[in-house]
Amino acid sequence: MKFAVALYHGEFEKSAFEKTQKWISALDTNLEYFEIQKTTVTELLENLIAGAENQNAESVIYTWSDCPFLDLELTKELCHQHEKYGAEYTFADGYPYGITPEIIHLGTLKILLQLSKQNPELGEGKVSRTSIFDLIKKDINSFEIETLISDKDFRLSRLEFASGTKFGKILCERFEKLIEAEEKKLGKTLCATEKCELAEKSPEILQ
């Protein structure tokens, strides 16, 4: 299956986007990506479809571009599950926002586009971080959904790693320093769960 990466841009710091680009290159040096900056959900879907078709991609790996901690191994596992089980929508559950992307099949995007037009309260609304899943929930039993479940549920901690706001940028900078210090101390690279556990027990991240 051919994948393309779609990055949704807000008015974000360039440094966050650079880290996201490194994540894409680490996934696959030949993986193409396209950028979107639209205001409504319907426009977002139209551009996701056009971008996928322009690259002859069957599915889109979708994320906002201000997520500097997207996990490489979890993304690869999501792609594997999406392809293996012929999923229409694949996501990870239990991890903080900003650790994993969403994967949407091209055919699903076309169905969601029609749903967005049938539900103007969503379709004409401004793009949010949950826009895709909000539409899927309108007819959730009609989709083949695959879920990668975290070994530990971090949702109660309300962690979110996105640097698109002033507070988010400060939080991500603190988290990056924590990870670097912990990896230096342990002499190894932390996996996604270990990073999240580190954040969960750090007052400077939870405040």
Identify the residue ranges that each predicted region occupies.
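Conserved donor-nucleotide/metal-binding helix-loop-beta segment in metal-dependent transferases, i.e.
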Residues: F69-Y97
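Conserved alpha/beta core of the MobA/IspD/sugar-nucleotide pyrophosphorylase nucleotidyltransferase superfamily
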Residues: R129-Q207
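Active-site nucleotide-sugar/metal-binding loop of Leloir-type enzymes
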Residues: L45-S59
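Basic phosphate/pyrophosphate-binding loop/patch that engages nucleotide-derived ligands
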Residues: L78-E88, T108-V127, K138
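A conserved hydrophobic position in a structured secondary element of the catalytic/binding core
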Residues: S65, L70, I104, S163-G164
